[in-house]
């Protein structure tokens, strides 16, 4: 099972809100996930990025690969040094 950190869309039409989740790479974008480790709200000014730093670091240390977008959000938030994105 290859674990990835990626965004799962939530919110309503025209007002997206995303959860940063750890999930199996074979699961659909908004499907079943292992754990939610953060949130991203692009509707606020400036966009709001939140992470549970302890759980984020746990998943990165266990080999979870962040998506390109999640890797960029981690850099913006300055929470951890992500592994290279796939």
Swiss-Prot record:
GO biological process: translation
SUPFAM superfamilies: Ribosomal protein S16 (SSF54565)
Pfam families linked: Ribosomal_S16
One of the record's GO cellular component terms: cytoplasm
UniProt keyword list: Ribonucleoprotein, Ribosomal protein
Xref: InterPro entries: Ribosomal_bS16, Ribosomal_bS16_dom_sf
Keyword Metal-binding: no
Lineage: superkingdom: Bacteria
GO terms assigned for molecular function: structural constituent of ribosome
Family that this chain belongs to: Belongs to the bacterial ribosomal protein bS16 family.
Stated name of the protein: Small ribosomal subunit protein bS16
Organism: Myxococcus xanthus (strain DK1622)
């Amino acid at each position: 099972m290859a674990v990835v950190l990626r965004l799962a869309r939530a919110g309503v039409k025209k007002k997206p809100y995303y959860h940063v989740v750890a999930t199996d790479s074979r699961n659909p974008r908004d499907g079943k996930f292992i754990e939610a480790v953060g949130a991203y709200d692009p509707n606020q000014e400036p966009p709001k990025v939140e992470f549970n730093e302890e759980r984020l670091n746990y998943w990165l240390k266990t080999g979870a690969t962040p998506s390109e977008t999640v890797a960029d959000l981690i850099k913006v938030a300055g929470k951890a040094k992500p592994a290279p994105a796939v």
